[in-house]
Structures are given as structure tokens and as C-alpha cells.
């Protein structure tokens, strides 16, 4: 089982947020993984 933190999703906008203890672990552990039949991309948050 893959352990990760709290997950929230945007209102059908194709994005979500995952809370990890370490940014590098989040990117390396989840980038490219299958989530509910979709291949996901994980990167650091960008300010608008």
C-alpha cells in the first residue's frame, strides 16, 4: 500500500492537493502513478 497524506481535489478542474511531509518524497513517490484510472503528474505548487 502506498502511504500518502490528505488528498483534496479541485472542482472538476483536473487538479488536486496531496499533503506529504517532504516535497521531494511527494514528487518522486506519486509522479506518473495511476490514480483512479488516470496517469497523474505531481509537481511543486506555483503561486499565481
From Swiss-Prot:
Its protein name is: Glycine-rich RNA-binding protein 3
Read off the Gene3D superfamilies from this record: 3.30.70.330
Asked whether the keyword RNA-binding is assigned, the reply is yes
Checking InterPro entries in the record gives: Nucleotide-bd_a/b_plait_sf (IPR012677), RBD_domain_sf (IPR035979), RNA-bind/splicing_reg (IPR051106), RRM_dom (IPR000504)
One GO molecular-function entry = RNA binding
Membrane-spanning parts? none
- Identify the keywords attached in UniProt to this record, alphabetized: RNA-binding
Carries keyword RNA-binding?
A: yes
Amino acid at each position: 500500500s502506498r502511504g500518502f497524506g490528505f488528498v483534496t481535489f479541485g472542482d472538476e478542474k483536473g487538479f488536486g492537493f496531496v499533503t506529504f511531509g517532504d516535497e521531494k518524497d511527494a514528487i518522486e513517490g506519486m509522479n506518473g502513478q495511476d490514480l483512479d484510472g488516470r496517469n497523474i503528474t505531481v509537481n511543486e505548487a506555483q503561486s499565481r
